């Protein structure tokens, strides 16, 4: 991270995401290392329209792919699933909440990975809370 008052860049967010990915227990998410992670500045208009969102600030991350619990035989062997993190909305949330940036990136990453595994919103919230509790103990 920059110590000179500059906002964290794409590479900074990517490094935080990679670190967070390697902190996630593999037993909880088998096959997690097969996901690719990308960091972009913000979602594009097409993405927002597909999701029914009007503002790019509403979307901090996106899972692109077919959740494991919805895959059929024809879906295997397709392009790897991807989690995209959006730097600018993440930074805005970071500023607004005062949360630690590594914790926020980890939360967004875990939320999107949980979509890959077909978790419900309730399961995702429980997982995020468990992860926050675990991070607080370290």
Task: Name each model feature, range by range.
Residues 1-104, 116, 120-126, 132-136:
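Active-site rim/adjacent substrate-binding subdomains
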Residues 108, 112-116:
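Catalytic glutamate of the conserved HExxH
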